[in-house]
Amino acid sequence: MNVDDVEDRDGVRLSWNVWPSSKIEATRTVVPISALYTPLKEREDLPPVLYEPVTCKPPCRAVLNPYCQIDVRGKLWICPFCLSRNAFPPHYKDISSTNLPAELLPKYTTIEYTLSRPAQIPPIFLYVVDTCMDDDDLKALREALVVSLSLLPPNALVGLITYGTMAQVHELGYDACPKSYVFRGTKEYAPKAIQDMLGLNPGARPMGAGAPGAPGGPSQAPRPPNATAQMGASRFLLPVSQCEFQLTQILEQLQKDPWPVANDKRSQRCTGVALSVAVGMLETTFPNTGARVMLFCGGPATEGPGMVVSTELRERIRSHHDIDKDNAKYYKRAIKFYEAMAKRAAGNGHTIDVFAGCLDQVGLLEMKGLANLTNGHMILADSFQMGIFKQSFHRLFQKDDQGHLQMGFNATLDVQCTKELKVSGLIGHAVSANKKSGCVGETEIGIGQTSAWKLCSLTPRTSAGIYFEVVTPAGQPMQPGSRGLIQFVTHYQHASGQYRLRVTTIARNFAEGGSGQIAASFDQEAAAVLMARIAVFKAEIDDSPDVLRWLDRMLIRLCQKFADYRKDDPTSFRLGENFSIYPQFMFHLRRSQFLQVFNNSPDETAFYRHVLNTEDVNNSLIMIQPTLMSYGFEGPPQPVLLDSVSIRPDVVLLLDTFFHILIFHGETVAQWRKAGYQDQEGYENFKEVLENPRADAQDLLADRFPIPRYIVCDQNGSQARFLLSKLNPSTTHMSGGMYGSSGNSGAAIFTDDVSLQVFMEHLKRLAVGASSN
């Protein structure tokens, strides 16, 4: 089985592709049976299926798939999950062994149904914009927002809230002059108060009554509460085609917050109130409808609910050290506030994106729940003028071949499995849908105690880690060739306005515990990423040393189980081909910014962890173990070891860490470049060595999201630290005698970190020695 082909077809990578037949054997394999699933994985050969799916009777409700046994004469099918017999619906009457519908063909283990019920409401985009920033930043942000209006579907509903010292909800339906409803930035508003002030409740009049379209007068006939709320909301949320001119005018005239700021103070910024108003407005008017709240913040919240630092500049925003020492004054209260906000949004299928444009921290750590629980985007840039923000923001609105946005809204993911397996949980950007089906296991990994989750929004990149446990007791006889099945069912609102159901069904064989088939089926790349997600999930709760010890313990146990060795003889230690680079992944994961917070701000740590929990196997591996290409005069570009020995004066290196793309010129290359040899005749070869990495870097930048930081640096330059921090320090200031290493063995790295070689020696010694618990 080629795991890449399976991923292309079904969007699934499994840690094990043959499963242990009993619970005890499954625990001995150390790495749990788990899947990294990309629900909207792009697949061009999927047929359009314009009818409703056939499902098993309740409570099973599994969807018809190629693994079902069918009786074409009796027009029956047997569900492989609950073994119930079901009759085909009347429109399947012409079914025969040579005339099968697409969902029963073996090549369509993944299929997407376009459901007959269209969405009642088009997608909603509510911009929440910070105005406490300098004029250049605000101008760049205004321009980006105006451009984004042209990228939205014409029928999409759009709204605008701006905030600084106060939060203002702009009434787009009033075109006589700019009009907005103002909320005080220091006050915490209950959802009902927000709805009353905006006139969204039946019988309520907005503050400043008499506004056009205000609902609820004594003479009006009663309406359903939601219809009334939507009428009230139509003053604030209008189709783009209807309000583009008005909204563009408001954006172009947007000024910096007028409240005076003393030299020793920060701006008064009420981020929490602005978000409360946005979430309160949407949950009343459009519950369980596809919507995105897009928050653009140019600095930290300094007043009202959700504040992360005071307005006094002499008070620094919290660091990792402050949080560890419980010395972060506003931290716990802010986390609690934003998480409660995120849960309210997620419960209604609404997504919150956070775009930060500031050199200092903006409180992304406290706000991480907004994006993590609603599967929103998180973008971190030094300013809104930077290409990282502008290109990432506009790339969000990419369209498919039919001209629809490549995003799904208000999504749920449901997982079904055969009786031998139970679902332990999901690690990714979701909240539990609290579905207590028979598939729910006792062991909890990530978001557990459910077999369904709300994802709120989806893109073709969204990947979720789902973890399982084997529950078959030991000693129970197993039928030869028996297999287990897992079905992933994703229901979402497509950008075209239709509801769609993507169904992926996979089957894998069971094998006895001692069988070599289990070891041979190990996918070390998928396993590394799925274990990295568990480690990061633990790191959010525990402190890092405990997580590192857990990772080391798991690695030692895996090697003890699957390596070949003679007891107490480290030189005899051998790992099979499909386990050989797993320890290397763990070495780089231990040193990565996901688990080592030194040199990163809390906001950066929150951002890096957010992105890791979004991406598929290949992109996640680049984050864990970056790729390094070498360009020299001796031959074509080639991948080289992520090691200090790869630094040579006569080569150019291209490092891809996913978050950074860095071109590094060796010492000699840098001197020649500065001397301008590349522009002289006869040095075309040198010019090519300089240009090739640039061209390859542009290819990497072309489809990456978020846009990585692009760095060009020279050996011994200050920016070279980005490369040196990622390399295995096989040559350090302590190698090769007292005064550093000799010239040809790579650059010396000044570090006390152990090298991969030392790490592997320790691993071998521990694996072949006494067993580790």
From Swiss-Prot:
Gene3D superfamilies: beta-sandwich domain of Sec23/24, Sec23/Sec24 helical domain, Severin, von Willebrand factor, type A domain, Zn-finger domain of Sec23/24. It comes from the Eukaryota. One of its GO terms (cellular component) is COPII vesicle coat. GO terms for biological process: COPII-coated vesicle cargo loading; intracellular protein transport. The keyword Transport applies. The keyword Cytoplasm applies. Belongs to the SEC23/SEC24 family. SEC23 subfamily. This is Protein transport protein SEC23. It comes from Mycosarcoma maydis.
